[in-house]
A protein has these predicted regions:
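Alpha-to-beta junction loops
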Residues: 16-17, 50, 133, 205-208
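Conserved N-terminal beta1-alpha1 strand-loop-helix module at the mouth
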Residues: 1-35, 48, 114
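Ser/Thr-centric signal marking residues that sit
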Residues: 4, 26, 42, 76, ...
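A residue-level signal for conserved active-site and pocket-lining positions in enzyme catalytic cores
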Residues: 11, 22, 80, 92, ...
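Metal-dependent phosphodiesterase/phospholipase catalytic core, i.e.
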Residues: 28-30, 35-144, 160-163, 167-170, ...
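Generic structural signal for well-ordered alpha-helices
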Residues: 8, 77-81, 99-103, 122-126, ...
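Short acidic catalytic loops
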Residues: 17-26, 95, 201, 209, ...
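C-terminal active-site rim and adjoining tail of enzyme catalytic domains
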Residues: 67-74, 139-224
Length: 224
């Protein structure tokens, strides 16, 4: 049950250092945890709200009615952070919504210095940086404009204050990781769920690897 409190609680029980999750903004302005553009795949939304209703068109009252399985509900950003902090660093992936709203909510919760906010939309990150320079930012890639994190890309990221380069694992090389470190950024990869990928991440000198199987990854790393 991805992006639910039971999933976050299970990861917290493993004492993981970082928890990555997805957030979108509702029509009412609330920020909730969901990956897709609608709730159909991860809940009974097709039955409750009608198939294909966009997240951005929903209200929080509507979302509260959804069942993600075994009674789990769609959590708000605030509810997710309550589970993760202080044990893990929340790695919040912006999937949709306004920079102003994210900054407002993180400041209201008093966690601006305890989370990392990442996005594939670097214009969103630039807006966040202008509003809240204290927020740690992660740049996800590749994207349609930037295929690889070369010197030019890393200079751009440093220019608006990004602290994390988070790249797709099969598009990331040792040189990219070295360039990121030389520019003062951490180098993360997504998403590796097999030992071969974890071994490669270690060889590349990555600072973190996102996985859907943290228990197996912990077992592997303890014997690496």
């Amino acid at each position: 049950m991805e992006n639910t409190l039971p999933a976050f609680e299970a990861a917290a029980a493993l004492d993981v250092a970082v928890q990555e999750f997805d957030v979108r903004q509702l029509r009412c302005g609330a920020l909730v945890c969901v990956h897709d553009e609608d709730f159909d795949r991860t809940s009974d939304a097709a039955e409750v709200l009608g198939a294909g209703k966009p997240v951005r068109a929903c209200t929080l009252d509507e979302v509260r009615r959804l069942d993600c399985g075994d009674g789990a509900r769609v959590p708000t950003l605030e509810e997710a952070l309550t589970v993760m902090l202080p044990g893990s660093v929340p790695l919040i992936e912006h999937k949709g919504g306004d920079a102003d709203r994210y900054v407002e909510e993180l400041q209201r919760l008093g966690v601006s210095d305890r989370v990392v906010l990442q996005s594939f939309d670097w214009r969103f990150l630039q807006r966040v940086a202008a509003l809240a320079p204290q927020l740690a930012l992660g740049a996800l890639g590749p994207n349609p404009i930037y295929a690889e994190p070369d010197e030019e890309v890393l200079a751009l990221l440093r220019g608006f204050g990004a602290e994390v380069l988070h790249w797709r694992a099969d598009a990331l090389t040792r040189r990219h990781a070295e360039l990121a470190h030389a520019a003062g950024l951490l180098a993360f990869s997504y998403t590796t769920d097999e030992p071969e990928g974890w071994r490669r991440g270690i060889e590349l000198g990555l600072d973190a690897m996102c996985t859907n199987d943290p228990a197996a990854m912990q077992d592997y790393m303890s014997g690496a």
